[in-house]
Design a protein with these regions (language model features):
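Hydrophobic faces of well-ordered beta-strands that scaffold small-molecule active sites
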Residues: 1, 8-18, 42-46, 93-96, ...
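Acidic-and-aromatic substrate-binding clefts and catalytic sites of carbohydrate-active enzymes
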Residues: 1-5, 20-28, 101-109, 134-141, ...
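Acidic (Asp/Glu)-rich catalytic clusters
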Residues: 2-16, 26-42, 83-89, 117-121, ...
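Active-site beta-loop-alpha junctions enriched in small/polar residues
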Residues: 17-23, 47-51, 98-100, 131-135, ...
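Active-site acidic/histidine proton-transfer and metal-coordination neighborhood
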Residues: 25-125
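Gly/Pro-rich active-site loop or hairpin
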Residues: 62-75, 136-197
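Acidic/histidine-rich catalytic cores of soluble enzymes
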Residues: 86-171
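C-terminal helical cap(s) of enzyme catalytic domains, especially alpha/beta-barrels
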Residues: 209-225
Length: 225
């Protein structure tokens, strides 16, 4: 999809976000190919995701929640994987905070202590996803401002914005990538008083030109205020 988009818009700078990283030879090769297509990307950005795919894929696809792996072992393994990634690629690696897969299971992945531990061990900067922060805070019955203040905000270089929605069955927040709400704009304004990202990315996955235009105009006004 990126290759086709580059052919249509050859002059537009593209920033590639890997998301969940596959730490093996096919994963590294795919990342190299993406970087070649997006040479303007200043960073390699990946999820700060110590949970193995064996856990996350069943949870996301089928709502199947397997037994939790060792938090200590999972975090140690992820730190080692990030360090190997840093050796393979010249671009700095930045890490995106994760939401909560479940309000009671696997919470170590999005604990502020885990994010601090990985950041300090790897030296990576932070990609702060505000939708993920809202979901992680709600899973802990914690005020989202208190949750965000517990993160390494001085290391934030990029932010992701996306509209959350509530699951009709569970009532829990999820990252819907819908239009931003009033609460999202207010949270962004509050966060920008405490962090200084170089990039802000709107993750909007719908095809409503009016909604996209409205969000971009409101974001521009807020950021430039």
């Amino acid at each position: 999809a990126i290759r086709e988009a580059r052919e249509i818009l050859p002059e537009m700078p593209f920033h590639f976000h890997q998301g969940r990283m596959r730490f093996d030879q096919p994963g590294y090769q795919a990342l190299r190919e993406y970087i070649q297509l997006c040479p303007q990307s200043p960073w390699v950005s990946i999820h700060l995701a110590p949970l193995p795919a064996l856990i996350t894929i069943p949870a996301l696809r089928w709502k199947l929640f397997l037994p939790q792996p060792s938090p200590t072992g999972s975090i140690r393994r992820f730190i080692q994987q990030v360090k190997k990634l840093q050796l393979r690629f010249k671009r700095p690696v930045i890490l995106e905070n994760m939401p909560a897969l479940h309000p009671r299971k696997y919470r170590f992945e999005s604990e502020p202590e885990t994010i601090w531990q990985v950041q300090e061990a790897t030296g990576c900067k932070l990609l702060l996803d505000l939708a993920h922060a809202r979901i992680a805070a709600e899973a802990r019955r914690m005020d989202v401002h208190a949750y965000i203040k517990a993160l390494p905000l001085e290391h934030v270089v990029q932010m992701h914005l996306a509209g959350t929605r509530r699951d009709e069955r569970s009532g829990r927040l999820y990252d819907a990538h819908q239009p931003l709400s009033r609460e999202d704009y207010e949270l962004l304004d509050w966060t920008l008083a405490r962090a200084a990202p170089e990039w802000i990315t709107l993750e909007y996955f719908r095809e409503d030109p009016a909604a996209l235009s409205d969000q971009l105009q409101r974001l521009a006004a807020l950021i430039q205020a």
